[in-house]
Amino acid sequence: MALTDLPITIGICAYNEAQIIERSIRSVYSQKLDGIVIDEVIVVSSGSTDGTDDIVKNLMSEYPNLRLIRQEKREGKNSAINCYLDSKKTEIVVMLNADNAFGTDESLQKLVEPLRADDVGITGGHPVPTNDPKDKVGFAVCLMWAMHHELAMIHPKIGELIAFKDIGTRLRTDMQSDEDMLRMKIEEAGMKCVYVGDSIILNRGPETLDDFIKQRVRVNVGECVMKKNFDYDIPTWNKKYLLKAMFASRKVVGFHPFKMLWVARLEMKCRKQAQEIADRGGDMPVWEQVKSTKKL
């Protein structure tokens, strides 16, 4: 690609995100861009009933290229992603969760820039949780995301924030996997994935143990289904990578061996439960919202 203005579309999936959607949208428009132009920000609200739609509509007068697409009933994230993929006009799409916000004003630029290369098809940002690591569950959240970052530096692992070239892939609505499915198809087309560690996206992890387990089981079910149905290996299941990532994560969370062991055992429990669900043919294309993650 030539070094000219690169048009992109921001896609945001929302379900009852009134508590955080405005901050997420404003974080997009606060980005400093050079040679990258946001054609549209498309919010797909899937069956929201809490005022999310009204908040987006009110912001549309301030941001003329902000667009709302409403799905009357909640159809799942993959359905919402397909909806904005079928509605956008640009090749490059940035996928942002409605309950996240950019952590720096250069994060979007850094995320998209690698896509100028012909051999790069998808990039992933660096999720940073706002949970308090002094709290027991907060420590688990911070450790998991610190390990995610360290592992991604070894072998790219993307999630929460991605940018990609649309090659025509549309997601199965009977599955929950989105980023991994898009990545698999892009890699099959001969392009590679790049992890952008300085493209920061803020998120909020669960605050209760029950919510943490619920979320980890769901995420792991999606990864187990990807392995079962497509024999696609997720790097976070590589034990060698995990050990290296846990050791390196001390830079962020400190060295707390007993807490780390507790988190490791908890994750093993969640993975075992997820594997059992996947083995029975289960998946979670529409999942119960984790309320404690909506306090960014």
Residue positions per predicted region:
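Short, well-formed alpha-helical segments that are part of the catalytic scaffolds
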Residues: 17-31
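Long helical/loop segments within the catalytic core of UDP-sugar-dependent glycosyltransferases
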Residues: 79, 111-168, 217-220
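Short beta-strand-to-loop acidic/aromatic patch adjacent to the donor-nucleotide binding site
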Residues: 90-101
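Catalytic donor/gating beta->alpha subdomain of glycosyltransferases that bind UDP-sugars
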Residues: 115, 122-138, 172-241
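A conserved acidic beta->alpha catalytic loop
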Residues: 27, 45-54, 73, 100-101
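Short beta-strand/loop segment that forms part of the nucleotide-sugar
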Residues: 37-47, 69-71
